[in-house]
Amino acid sequence: MAVQMAAELEMAADIVLGPPNLVSAEQRATAESIFINFRKSVCPYTMCKELLETSKNDYVLFEASGLIKDALIREWNELPAQDIHALRTYLLQYVISNPSCSAFVRERIVQVIAIMVKRQSVEDGGKDRSLVIAEVQQLIASGNQQMQMMGCAIITALMQEYATTVKSSDVGLPWELHFKVKKQFESTDLQTIFRFSISALKELSAQIVLPLNSDMEYLLRRLVMISETVLSWTFINVNLPKKLISVFESDQSPSLRPGVAWKEILLEPSLVPFIFDFHWRVRSSSSISHHTLSCLVQLASLNGQTLNAKNLRLEHLTTYIRSLTQLIENISRTASIPGKEALGISTIVRKLILFYPPNILVNIEGELLQKYLEQLVSLTCGFLRASLSPGTDEEEQLLFNEVSNLLQRRKNFRLIFILGI
């Protein structure tokens, strides 16, 4: 039956995807009706698994995995726990065993796994999720680049499912439960993911040889994007009304404001210096450096319960400015700074001034502060000089943003100089 079903669906897929000059409107409508009826199938898990095993048509594989997703959401409460676990295990092993399957098919199956894990975490408190993440960590640590990329895809899908509460509606849960499981995820496995992503980047940074080959560049980019997602996470510590949560989650550049449980992780002394060093190593790769700069911008905005004492704020600021001045010094030796990197650095400065006002800034070591301020003056003058040179509209807009970032808080700098620094 599975062979017959696969043949019928594959024929319909060829018609649906066929060019208009070879497929009549009637043929296309008939083929589309086959998939419409297919999507209505009840308890289709065995049939879909057989299709995944036998069909070589990507469109059929995509539809089969989509049907699993829709059926799971619809029938979750009727399914025995052991059947759910067996299906999740099967899907995970399927994507691991078929690393060469089409990207859009893989992403759909990975999304189904993430939805299952999130839905299960409502009932088991995240136990199954922790098992999945542990298994995925082994993939990333395996040294096999295909398995590492697969592991990154699964982690990314999990994070996407937990990242928002208001917009998450495709797992059959009310938004209040989305909020509950998101908080549960933040306090446990999100920390595990961040620690592991940084650890993997540290290990891989020693293997960086420029120019990067495509596989290494892709893997590094996915790992940095995982770290970036954590550092850009919308941490909401109280159960606010849905409309207010929507406002927070719509913020495109939220500050980094985690709970006190993140103190040990984010204030680890080597974290900030490592990310600055890693950015310096990969700055020639625009596909990665964009994300490393985003990580650094977010760390510049660190505030809240993690820095609940003045000495902690001062220590973090000192560590950050020391690493920043070293980066600027290294860049100055090259006598070249790409526009997007310049914009990133100016955004970092703007965030530092915004979250660490003069009454904090003046307390860092005098020599370091003097060096930092001199570099800011030099950068501002350099950007202004560059703005006088002819360039493209994009370059001119970048320069305008860079100068605006550096001059936006000029009153704060004036106060620092008045205080005698």
Identify the function of each model-found stretch.
Residues 1-53:
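N-terminal "cap/leader" segments of large eukaryotic alpha-helical scaffolds
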Residues 1-24, 178-182, 254, 398-402, ...:
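Proline/serine/threonine/glycine-rich intrinsically disordered regulatory regions
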Residues 2-8, 39-46, 81-100, 125-146, ...:
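Amphipathic alpha-helical segments within extended alpha-helical solenoids and repeat-rich scaffolds
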Residues 16, 35-39, 67-75, 112-120, ...:
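Hydrophobic residues within the alpha-helices of tandem HEAT/HEAT-like
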Residues 27-28, 61, 65, 102, ...:
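Residue-level detector of extended alpha-helical repeat arrays and alpha-solenoid scaffolds
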Residues 57-101, 107, 111:
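Eukaryotic helix-linker segments that join adjacent hydrophobic helices
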